[in-house]
Amino acid sequence: MPVVGRAEAQVPAAGPIRPKLYDEEVMTESNEIPEPPAIAWEVFPGEAMDRARVYAELLAGSGVERGLLGPREVPRIWDRHMLNCGVVAEVVPENTTLVDIGSGAGLPGVVLAIIRPDVRVTLLEPLLRRTVFLSEITEILKLDNVEVLRGRAEELAYKRVFDVATARAVTPLDRLVAWSLPLLREGGELLAMKGERAAEEIENARRQLQASGARSVELVTVGEGKVEPPTTLVRVVAGRPPGNGKRRRRKR
């Protein structure tokens, strides 16, 4: 499974990063991004805010042009996308490895990599045009903690092991559990970003959770007081699959 792109191991100099991100002649008022709300500086502290603003511009420019983000999403890019994903960093353990399944335009994987340089992030995406976009933005943002990998989660099962898996708007929970738990060490966590039907999805996934050897499942709310509505996560802790001893423990 080929690695499409890896960011250079170089930290940008202090100050804002301002590359040319799109064809300015085709940029219109409809996809000009709003100023970030004040809370964004808390979610993206220090240098992370410079990178976050550039990433938001990338999404609104090249991301819209390539069909990775709808133009109607641009006016709410901070609240609905950047901050909604950024608050997930609150529950990601320190110094971990994380795979973002079906990363798409990089939400939440790129956002988490910006906020948490201590976390090694793999952006897993099957479509070539998306992996090309992800590789370009990781290089522009100089995220040396990011790997872009073209492929599907089910193809990577038991070949790589991670501490955390994330996913946003990829597939129903039962299928996501089947794809993600084989990528996790025993005790690793799936953090699935879900909406108001999250509890219903958990009930519909009970059989798959048991078959996949899930140790526990719970609803977690993050970002209260920072985003409205707060972000809802389904957190699944991986156990040992029934009759399967392949899952690995984290090395200490």
Question: Which residue ranges define each predicted feature?
Answer:
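S-adenosylmethionine
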Residues: 4, 14-16, 119-252
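Residue-level preference for alpha-helix termini and adjacent loops
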Residues: 43, 67-68, 76, 82, ...
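Class I SAM-dependent transferase core
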Residues: 3-4, 8-95, 99, 129-146
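Short, well-ordered helical secondary-structure segments
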Residues: 56-59, 70, 75, 108, ...
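Conserved SAM-binding loop of SAM-dependent methyltransferases across substrates and taxa
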Residues: 105-118
